[in-house]
């Protein structure tokens, strides 16, 4: 069936290798993207193809099904960055967001210190508008380059894009994020701030276990982790999945967790909080085995 593609693909690739949860069955088809030209060819084909597909980066916000994904998984590994001016940088979407924040802050550039410790790619950070209480990806964003649903390469300015808390316009449209351009400032204290941020993350978050970071978006004015803690759910274990004792909004893989274990924990949290009149919205992307079921 791989001859259905005008480019090389792999078959039956385990997705647990491409998730920070270390959970997931095999992708029916798998393609690593390493250049913009290659991505343009792939999306030009997919525009006219019925084959379902998903795009992943570091897999740091995805829970894959135990059976895997019955379609094509595109792994974004497009690397590179260029300074357009003294304080403006264009970064390709497969670059590690955390590494970018660390490198820039160590060189005295401010604007992306908050990225240190966020385990996704630049593309994933734009897609989720990743951030902290201090800043988010859109804060320093100048423009985004995308390949649209028809396979066209477009550049969109920040002013054309509506971002909000953990939300970007790309969550509701079919587009591949190619690059992001960020506006930085010179600041000799940037490295010190980045160091303090990562130390705080290590102190408060369970980095010693596989996870995908925060499972739920914070409701307005309150921490989802604090609500889960107050509900007495920290430490709850189902199979190999556990609500972290360290941070209530983290579910960790203690060894052999399945997607079913994690989904049951998510459902338990939501049901418990709903009884208190609180509706928690998932931040993690649940990737179904059958693509026609949609992505929640």
Curated annotation (Swiss-Prot):
It is found in: Cytoplasm. The active site is at 166, 214 (proton donor), 283. GO terms for cellular component: cytosol. The keyword Cytoplasm applies. Keywords: Cell cycle, Cell division, Cell shape, Cell wall biogenesis/degradation, Cytoplasm, FAD, Flavoprotein, NADP, Oxidoreductase, Peptidoglycan synthesis. One of its GO terms (molecular function) is UDP-N-acetylmuramate dehydrogenase activity. One of its GO terms (biological process) is peptidoglycan biosynthetic process. InterPro entries: FAD-bd_PCMH, FAD-bd_PCMH-like_sf, FAD-bd_PCMH_sub1, FAD-bd_PCMH_sub2, MurB, MurB_C, MurB_C_sf, Oxid_FAD_bind_N. Its main location: cytoplasm. It comes from the Bacteria. It catalyses: UDP-N-acetyl-alpha-D-muramate + NADP(+) = UDP-N-acetyl-3-O-(1-carboxyvinyl)-alpha-D-glucosamine + NADPH + H(+). Pathway: Cell wall biogenesis; peptidoglycan biosynthesis. The keyword Magnesium does not apply. Residues 22-187 form the FAD-binding PCMH-type domain. Its EC number is 1.3.1.98. Its cofactor is FAD. PANTHER family: UDP-N-ACETYLENOLPYRUVOYLGLUCOSAMINE REDUCTASE. Cell wall formation. Belongs to the MurB family. This is UDP-N-acetylenolpyruvoylglucosamine reductase. It comes from Chlamydia muridarum (strain MoPn / Nigg).
